[in-house]
Design a protein with these regions (language model features):
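Short conserved active-site loop signatures built around small residues
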Residues: 1-29
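Structural motif
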Residues: 9, 27-28, 78-80, 101
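A short glycine-rich, His/Asp/Glu-containing loop-to-beta-strand
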Residues: 27-32, 44
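Conserved PLP-anchoring active-site segment centered on the Schiff-base-forming lysine
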Residues: 95-101
Length: 101
């Protein structure tokens, strides 16, 4: 498999034009409330919260595209975009520290 140059990754990553009617850049979704047909669908979305929108503060297709792009560029497994610097610091510390640290 041919290695993709960094410049190409920067241009292509996080974009799925054929999922968006051929439009290159993903649309900007601004949402706080997400509706579901029933509670079963809501529960399903909550268990898959990092891949599906269930509450606007936890991600929209726009933030998912950003997270995918950053992970791809950094050769990481996954990225989580947060709403503030304090929340990103907290997530980082809570991921690596135990209660007696």
């Amino acid at each position: 498999m041919k290695k993709i140059k960094k410049e190409t990754k920067l241009v292509l990553t996080g974009r799925k034009p054929f999922d968006n009617y051929g439009i290159v850049n993903p649309p900007i979704y601004r949402a706080s409330t997400i509706l579901f047909k029933n509670t079963k669908e809501l529960r399903k979305a909550i268990t898959n919260r990092f891949n599906q929108t269930y509450y606007g503060r936890y991600g929209t297709p726009t933030t998912f595209a950003l997270e995918e792009g950053i992970a791809e560029i950094e050769n990481g497994y996954r990225t989580i975009a947060t709403s503030s610097g304090m929340s990103s610091i907290s997530i980082t510390l809570l991921s690596f520290l135990s209660k007696d640290d």
